[in-house]
Amino acid sequence: MILIADSGSTKTDWCVILNGTPIKRIGTKGLNPFFQSEEEIQQELTHSLLPQLPEGTINSVYFYGAGCTPEKAPVLRRAIADSLPIVGNIKAYSDMLAAARGLCGHEAGIACVLGTGSNSCFYDGKEIVNNISPLGFILGDEGSGAVLGKLLVGDILKNQLSPAIKEAFLKQFDLTAPEIIDRVYRQPFPNRFLASLSPLDRKSVV
């Protein structure tokens, strides 16, 4: 049995492969070693992934995820090894490499990721050969859900948009200004929270 994972900061899509055939797809929360500790990743794997896996041992895991830099990938590999019944290799790569391989195959090209965060690279057909650090939603991640949500919330709370839009926004997401401040500055995963606010209902602004 082989596991392949594609993970952003908000969600992870898992595919279980048996004898070369995908047999099950599983969804869990995002696993990002840049924002989460080894223990937090283990907890998510144990509680959300393990109960949904078919019985048996896992021969290999191929994990492509946000935050899986060479420095942080070992954190993820250890968490997986300590949480799942694995007898083979655990490979952890960046989600950017997954996007490049999926988009370009064996050809050279530019690939981009746009989700809770954002990233881009130049790919030579085998590996990523040039990449500018996205820097996260505070310093970078331009165009991402977290940054769009941050800009929208900032304009709303500073009364840069009409009272009608502000009222519609707070009603749609069932939030107050103090609750937003608390979620951004005091609660974990403000990037996920801000990204969840970016899709303001079009009916609210027309």
Located regions from the model:
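Active-site neighborhood for divalent-cation/phosphate handling
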Residues: 87-111, 122-131
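Short, well-ordered amphipathic alpha-helical segments that serve as non-catalytic structural scaffolds
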Residues: 38-53
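Short beta-strand-loop/turn "lid" adjacent to the catalytic site in phosphate-handling enzymes
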Residues: 52-91, 103-104, 187
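Conserved ATP-utilizing enzyme core subdomain
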Residues: 160-200
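Short N-terminal binding/cap micro-motifs at the start of the first secondary-structure element
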Residues: 11-15, 23-24, 34-37
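Conserved small/polar residues in nucleotide/adenosyl-binding loops
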Residues: 203-206
